[in-house]
């Protein structure tokens, strides 16, 4: 390559980089501001629910109206995260801008009346809808739209959790299992950092988690404990199986609601009756809402699972039940924060069984169950480092990667595609959506059941 050609090539790279910075930073500022508004509203809604316990009885009405409004005015927005992933894989009509206000209001309403849901799905949809609007105004081509949508995902994720590096990697990793979308690396990183900074500039503070195990020991002098590593490996397998069960049961519950209740607005009414019944059956409301904090110190919360003095064996299971019923019926929000709760609770229980540090295992479960349910082990490992520190990197990596392998070809995102199979023995064509893999698996299972009945 001649000198002139070399400098011309570098100039084109710099020009492309400058263009993307100019495009994604304003978009990320908008997304970060919306995420700040969302987190502030969510905090107020959660506080209001604790202050006014009777709000739970409005759950059936809220759910009915929410789905009814989506049916009449939110057409094209109902696909949620799966719609955004589909648009990145195969750009079509784009992500409607109305998705942003619809998902923000409906998620806050879900939490106000006690639905067990999260916030990641809302943040990603805020990012995707704003990014799509910027793409339409900028008249971008299909390839550029894909990159901007990925940057929108990174912005939403990075801002809502305060983990910009994990947000950038999540946007590259979540689309296709086993394959990273490196063409969007710089735009996604810039968007995640800008959105996170904007969210902080609005005064939003994120929860800080503390792991007492090995506190004060620099990461550079850390040496592995072989027995503890073996326990972490076993826990990683269990986290992956838990993630697989959560994903499969979520999709099965959603299909069951659609099969047995054709009128969509009635589904959340039925779910509300189930949830309120469970509250009175169990005698507690601790599995409602986000589950990050509670004014009642005896309630199970994500923060509480990091306390070595607390042992809770079944909170992870009940939180999974409450979340699956809530989201599969049509209430809005994300699955990720409930997955954090489920993982931290399961980690706390496994620590008691294995004789391991409770705070460390709560942290491992926090990220590993998420890794298994979304097939994003690298992003989750990085998130663990951003939230809990680099001292525990090896344990975080082992837990996340084993959970990813053991969760199989399942995902909470049915639009996610298979790039590289997790096992060489899996004869699944590349770029097959998880939705098709699951449908094939269900048909095969039904066929085997019919054959067994005939015999």
UniProtKB/Swiss-Prot annotation:
It comes from the Bacteria. The keyword Transcription does not apply. Keywords: Cell inner membrane, Cell membrane, Membrane, Transmembrane, Transmembrane helix. GO terms for cellular component: plasma membrane. PANTHER family: CHLORIDE CHANNEL PROTEIN CLC-E, CHLORIDE TRANSPORTER. Belongs to the chloride channel (TC 2.A.49) family. This is Symbiosis-assisting ClC homolog. It comes from Rhizobium tropici. The gene is sycA.
